[in-house]
């Protein structure tokens, strides 16, 4: 006769709390950029995996998980309980940072959105315009517009890495407010940001950018426009990042 082990529910829950969340490469790169010992806010938290991981690792002392939709936020609440961080993680229904205050976060992560939406969220939270606040941004699209908008608004990128998640290539930006607005960025800075040549996944990111710029160049040529600036940027990016070596 087969024997069955009976496992108490409280034992299972204890085992769950001891589990560590494993983040995908994109979110792990965001986690890597968060400073140690901070209060963190994750905007567009989805299932709450990032703030849970930051609390588990000890990088974050407290966390606010914010989302505009109730369903993913309910999932974040359940996951916080499941992994034993409910006492340090608050889940908030919020459009961007509208329901948060400066006391909620030292580091603010906005990941998994388009660059223009990220800019809107930042522009609507005046309290981010303080040098002690740190932004970790991961645009899914229009990273060039995000960089331009950040510099035009007095923010500066102090670090940027490319990250490949197995399917797509992204960038993650570390950003602080300086108050010094810049409205004209070189094309290489606009499209490659602060990604260092030779850094992991930089050549793959450059290949993606070059594909986009070459399409722009073809469109300009077809319309009879001046392609000189684009040509120079394409040549500079190709020489610096050597995407053909990827």
Region spans (language model):
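Short SAM/SAH-binding signature in class I
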Residues: 105-112
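Conserved SAM-binding motif I beta-strand of class I
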Residues: 62-67
